[in-house]
Amino acid sequence: MSDSPKNAPRITDEADVVLIGAGIMSSTLGAMLRQLEPSWTQIVFERLDGPAQESSSPWNNAGTGHSALCELNYTPEVKGKVEIAKAVGINEKFQVSRQFWSHLVEEGVLSDPKEFINPVPHVSFGQGADQVAYIKARYEALKDHPLFQGMTYADDEATFTEKLPLMAKGRDFSDPVAISWIDEGTDINYGAQTKQYLDAAEVEGTEIRYGHEVKSIKADGAKWIVTVKNVHTGDTKTIKANFVFVGAGGYALDLLRSAGIPQVKGFAGFPVSGLWLRCTNEELIEQHAAKVYGKASVGAPPMSVPHLDTRVIEGEKGLLFGPYGGWTPKFLKEGSYLDLFKSIRPDNIPSYLGVAAQEFDLTKYLVTEVLKDQDKRMDALREYMPEAQNGDWETIVAGQRVQVIKPAGFPKFGSLEFGTTLINNSEGTIAGLLGASPGASIAPSAMIELLERCFGDRMIEWGDKLKDMIPSYGKKLASEPALFEQQWARTQKTLKLEEA
């Protein structure tokens, strides 16, 4: 009988690819690699007992198909001019997502697209003279751009009431309002999409182990030793992998740290929680059919942009408003209250201190949000829906976000980032994704960037297949309107977005 302890690692398995986390990012990369290298073996590890239970879960995010059609933080006003470059860039990336999803639907990898994507108009909303002027200027800057065609503008009571009856009821129209509207927006259930990806993965031979938490990643020559613990039995085992992707949400940074790669030195994470108001009145839910985004309060961070959102989840319409910010030291919704404190290292203390000194507005915003009760949250909703009643809404907890803090030189020492950040080692054998919005909406673009950075020597070989999956690969649709029109028509049909 062996003298080894009960929980000692068992005989090492091997895999070409280990994917950590059963969310939208890992499942997207897995699907992409199965298209490009179907002979590569893949193993997915997920600490929870099912897929898409953290940020990919449909009620843990707003489900916006982030194409910058309505999100005002992507079109800042600088010296009196609305800048659209970021919006165009995000829209380009969302077109890549549509093409990739369409290819997988055509290939039978993704099944019924209506389970995960549905047409919902995207609307930008402004109230008060300054915001109305901004909405008008934003509309003028975007309306003739090929990627934003079909956008309309209105600032009259009749049109507003026709399109947004819930928001019009009880409103004092002596205070000016304006909307820009585009019918071709979408609502996306990333949880359902993740499940479709992983169902197909299992059929194609990918091993998915739920209830397994990755505890460490260590280099072994050119490969990686991944130590995994069964959360139910306590047993541990090790897997040797050629490539590791850390798609573990808020836990990604610490896992990348355990791998010892220098590229994460000085990086830190700042956790931000969120709350939604979810409508419980079916009559009200049926009266609203749009995702309506407004402007964040002065001094508030981009994550606080308020929106009144139609959702389509498992074929049923829903309605939410938020998000309301909050704070907890947990890095995952199902994480530990010690997460933040465990993440502090000597090399990232300057980053934390630098951000603490610079981000007074964020601190003030979070304190204010944490102190809000239901009545205060309802007051914020009434700026959008004047006759909202407390009894028609319940508070639910959204997914946990960990904003990236990047190291910086003197005098800042650290900078708080509000997008997504891809980190990989110089050899391209391990990578991870950090950060938040626009996140899931641009997962295919993020994973293509990963392929280019980690598998650069294979990109020529993969070129034809990538163009088969994503016909606009290597091109900018903004400068090729004919290709955009062709792919738009194709994806509208394939994803069943033309159907009512």
From Swiss-Prot:
Family matches, as Pfam families: Mqo
Biological process terms from the Gene Ontology for this record are: tricarboxylic acid cycle
Give membrane topology per the record: Peripheral membrane protein
Q: How is the cofactor bound?
A: The FAD is tightly bound.
Query: Which InterPro entries does its entry note?
Result: FAD/NAD-bd_sf (IPR036188), MQO (IPR006231)
What molecular function does GO assign, one term?
2-hydroxyglutarate dehydrogenase activity
Q: Name one GO cellular component term.
A: plasma membrane
Q: Which UniProt keywords apply?
A: Cell membrane, FAD, Flavoprotein, Membrane, Oxidoreductase, Tricarboxylic acid cycle
- Catalysis: reaction(s): (S)-malate + a quinone = a quinol + oxaloacetate
- Places the protein is found: Cell membrane
Its domain of life reads Bacteria
Which pathway? Carbohydrate metabolism; tricarboxylic acid cycle; oxaloacetate from (S)-malate (quinone route): step 1/1
Principal location class: membrane
- What influences the activity of this protein, per its activity regulation comment? Activated by lipids.
Report the EC code(s) recorded for this entry: 1.1.5.4
What is the name attached to this protein's record?
Malate:quinone oxidoreductase
Organism listed in the record: Corynebacterium glutamicum (strain ATCC 13032 / DSM 20300 / JCM 1318 / BCRC 11384 / CCUG 27702 / LMG 3730 / NBRC 12168 / NCIMB 10025 / NRRL B-2784 / 534)
User: What gene does this protein come from?
Assistant: mqo
